[in-house]
Amino acid sequence: MRIRSSWEAAIDITAPAQGKGLIMPNEQLPGIEQAFGVLRQFTRSRRSSSEPLERCELCSAGLAHEHPHLVELATRTIVCACDPCALLFDNAAIGKYKRVSRRALRLADFAMTDAQWDGLLIPINMAFFFRSSLENRVVALYPSPAGAVESLLPMEAWQEIEESHGALMQLKPDIEAFLINRVGHAHGSAQAEYYIAPIDDCYRLVGVIRMHWKGLSGGAEVWTEIGRFFSDLRVRSEVISEVPHA
């Protein structure tokens, strides 16, 4: 038995009676059409909501909202991946990609003097540092309205800080970064914050600033979004006591 479509059922209802069906007064037709219009919209929305918003950039499989990320080492590009593809690059020592770590640590008692910070030659009060396995060096980046900007890092200044703090010696190359937020400290409104953060979170911070920055000072919206970013990171981070080396 063939099942009729909604449109066919509507035609039967409104057609002249030939020993079957029901004659519907003409004034009720708009209501019928409106009802089927709502039904079509509901069907389309159900279908579209079941489709994945993102796809794996390696195999094109549909992705859930929460999914793994890879970093392409040569370009420092963050790549969305499905679980099976991400597993191929889990703890990878060599290759084109590495799976991004999900570890987030807040270094509660990390100490850095203003002189040490100035020695890193970062022009703003926010930056992140990661060890590049391809370049065999520490890369310093800071967010800007134009995106991530690399800063030439004075290695002596970095080594002085790194050698005094064991947590920095344990950074996983390419996939973790030392993230510093000294904005509140510079304005005397909050303490400086220091994190070991997934590298994709650091690039997400760059994206937040690039998307919301307006004018010369950024505007209220961007500072609200920056505050929201660090509030979220604070909640997700494990707090550890960072004991400086002697």
Where do the PLM segments sit?
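Conserved, surface-exposed functional patches that form binding/active-site neighborhoods
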Residues: N125-H187
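Long, charge-rich boundary regions
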Residues: D83-V149
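C-terminal, charged low-complexity interaction regions
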Residues: E160-A246
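N-terminal cysteine/histidine-rich coordination modules
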Residues: M24-A104
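Basic polycationic patches enriched in arginine
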Residues: R2-R4
